[in-house]
A protein has these predicted regions:
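Membrane-interacting alpha-helical segments
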Residues: 2-150
Length: 150
């Protein structure tokens, strides 16, 4: 009996390249998952050298922001090459405007988790992935209304 090869649906990949809403959110979420995971590992390794909760939260925000910015720029440039660098700056501007909310939620929740005795790396993951979910929802609603995703 002959078996047919397994075929994976290409719909998500097609949507990634054709839908701005899906593309921008996928790039940001992937960049934030990568940056949050890397930051959690870095903070967990450095925790003994970071003297206070405030120092941990501050270093977390700086490391996470730097990694996220670099990863997103690479992903967005790959997926939107035809739109040029100005499109990258336009989307990054929206991210920078929303960054205070992202880091207020992420840092605030991380600080509370540290105060509750949660390990630093786990606190980073919970706090910053929660912040991503909140800010992505707000940005998506704004982007649909403002025309960013057209």
């Amino acid at each position: 009996m002959r078996t047919r090869p397994v075929r994976f649906p290409m719909e998500p990949l097609n949507r990634y390249k054709t839908s701005r809403l899906w593309n921008i959110n996928a790039n940001i979420v992937l960049a934030d998952i990568v940056s949050t995971s890397a930051t959690a590992l870095i903070i967990q390794l450095l925790q003994s050298k970071l003297t206070t909760r405030l120092v941990i939260v501050t270093v977390t925000a700086i490391v996470d922001g730097t990694i996220s910015l670099a990863v997103f720029a690479g992903l967005h440039t790959y997926a939107n090459r035809a739109r040029g660098i100005t499109d990258l700056f336009r989307v990054q501007l929206h991210r920078w405007i929303l960054s205070p909310l992202h880091y207020l939620v992420g840092s605030g929740l991380q600080f509370m988790l540290l105060a509750a005795g949660v390990r630093a790396g786990i606190g980073v993951l919970v706090a910053y992935l929660s912040a991503v979910a909140i800010v992505r929802t707000i940005h998506s609603l704004y982007g649909k209304k403002s025309g960013l995703f057209h």
